[in-house]
Amino acid sequence: MLLLECKPDEVLAHTLGVARRDCLHHNDKGRVCNALQKRQGCVAMIDEDPSSAQPPYLATLVIESDQHGLRVFRDPARQHRVVIVRPRLEEWLIATAQHAQVQVADFGFSERGNAMHRDINSKLPKLEELIEALLCTRSVRLLHLQRLIA
């Protein structure tokens, strides 16, 4: 089971090959963490959101790796993997596109994280196209995320 924060996370997961039935959408990082505390053997993907308060659950996790803008933690007691996208999905996607030499503007998105964050929910089909374009380039960052969540 993959626990996610928001609709753009769901689009990303589905485009990377995670079945819809295997995704649980929660509305924010705190709710994802609460759900993790009640389950066993899940994977979660959340934004780091460094400027916001962090759920206490995150302090109980053990770091596994930190590469490609993804910090991976595990919860040994509950057998969870928590993938933290740094700093937020939007900035991570912009950096991933730049690394792959794909222009996010070609898909109607701004190169600025806050602007992309504001628009992303109204452009989910374009987000899917962007992710598919990144997959076609064999983006190392995106393929790393795919291995972690799929």
PLM region spans:
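Acidic, divalent-metal-binding catalytic cores of TOPRIM
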Residues: M1-A150
